[in-house]
Amino acid sequence: MNQDHPECDSEELTQNSPETDPLKVEVETLRGEIASIKADVLRERAELENQRKRLIRDVEQARKFANEKLLGELLPVFDSLDAGLTASGSEPSPLRDGLELTYKQLLKVATDNGLMLLDPVGQLFNPEHHQAISQTEVTDVEPGYVIQVFQKGYLLNERLLRPALVVVAKQD
């Protein structure tokens, strides 16, 4: 620096000021790019984590409901076994005992795989699980309660597989 000529110093300062120093400009530009890249990396990590969680949830749902088609196709078999037990009466016989044992074993296997039987006699009508096919006037039952089940309903892992077909009590 020249103390005798201050105008020279201001010229040098202007050339080396932060606004015009190419290195400082480049450093600031690179810092901005680094910050942008860091933000992009964080967004990508968050997206990957969300995809991983979605995949885990989808696999869990697929596993939970993989038997839905098979169990749905077994419902008529349950209906037939139930009808056979009803038709055989209440008197014990080897045929009735065998039919009942088969029904219970099949139902146990199905319940172990998430199937739940809906037999709502005496319960309040629930439109999410029951389908009313008629209403009947009854004096000894509160209105809105199920008094007869024509066809049992089923849930699979708390999701409706088939509604129960029911008769509901109504007011006189």
UniProtKB/Swiss-Prot annotation:
Belongs to the GrpE family. One of its GO terms (cellular component) is cytosol. Coiled coil: none annotated. The keyword Chaperone applies. One of its GO terms (molecular function) is unfolded protein binding. This is Protein GrpE. Residues 1-23 are annotated as: Disordered. SUPFAM superfamilies: Coiled-coil domain of nucleotide exchange factor GrpE, Head domain of nucleotide exchange factor GrpE. HAMAP family: GrpE. Keywords: Chaperone, Cytoplasm, Stress response. Gene3D superfamilies: 3.90.20.20, Head domain of nucleotide exchange factor GrpE (2.30.22.10). InterPro entries: GrpE (IPR000740), GrpE_coiled_coil (IPR013805), GrpE_head (IPR009012). Its main location: cytoplasm. GO terms for biological process: protein folding. Homodimer. PROSITE patterns: GRPE (PS01071). It is found in: Cytoplasm. CDD domains: GrpE. The keyword Chaperone applies. Participates actively in the response to hyperosmotic and heat shock by preventing the aggregation of stress-denatured proteins, in association with DnaK and GrpE. It is the nucleotide exchange factor for DnaK and may function as a thermosensor. Unfolded proteins bind initially to DnaJ; upon interaction with the DnaJ-bound protein, DnaK hydrolyzes its bound ATP, resulting in the formation of a stable complex. GrpE releases ADP from DnaK; ATP binding to DnaK triggers the release of the substrate protein, thus completing the reaction cycle. The lineage of its organism: Bacteria, Pseudomonadati, Pseudomonadota, Gammaproteobacteria, Lysobacterales.
